[in-house]
């Protein structure tokens, strides 16, 4: 299945200046779901953000709440499909200050900037696993990085003197 995503994304990619959505260039919902599935499983094994994390909230989530992982994979897939220009609408399960609700969804996990960066590295490896072309990979990673402040807001709020 790995090369299929890269082949689909390459086949659907347009020349620079095209108005083809990132969703289409990634290969659509099935290709996005494959990457999200791989990515979600890989986070659990990550030493910084996964089941052995120094962060007790992340460690607890990745060891005691894995029954929620299928739903989280669905929500992540829906979120990526929606924000990449696909024909889907994402509604956060915990609405927050932003329309995506990322700060509310992640606040109790107190994700640090280092942990966020570790998850970004996991995402990079998942995109590489599926041979996502460089341009699309950079768009996905930039979109992910754009939400760092929202995702790490709970950690920042818990810091002394904040």
Language-model-detected regions and their locations in the chain:
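Core of compact, soluble alpha-helical bundle domains
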Residues: 2-162
């Amino acid at each position: 299945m790995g090369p299929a995503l890269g082949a689909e994304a390459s086949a659907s990619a347009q020349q620079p200046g095209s108005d083809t959505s990132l969703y289409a260039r990634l290969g659509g919902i099935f290709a996005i779901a494959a990457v999200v599935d791989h990515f979600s499983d890989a986070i659990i094994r990550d030493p910084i953000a996964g089941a052995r994390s120094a962060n007790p909230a992340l460690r607890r989530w990745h060891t005691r709440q894995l029954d929620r992982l299928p739903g989280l994979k669905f929500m992540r897939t829906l979120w990526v499909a929606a924000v990449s220009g696909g024909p889907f609408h994402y509604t956060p399960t915990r609405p927050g200050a932003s329309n995506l609700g990322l700060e509310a969804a992640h606040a109790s996990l107190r994700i640090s900037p280092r942990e966020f960066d570790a998850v970004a590295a996991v995402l990079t490896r998942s995109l590489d696993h599926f041979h996502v072309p460089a341009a699309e990979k950079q768009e996905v990673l930039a979109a992910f990085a754009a939400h760092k402040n929202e995702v790490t807001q709970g950690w920042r709020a818990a810091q002394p003197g904040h």
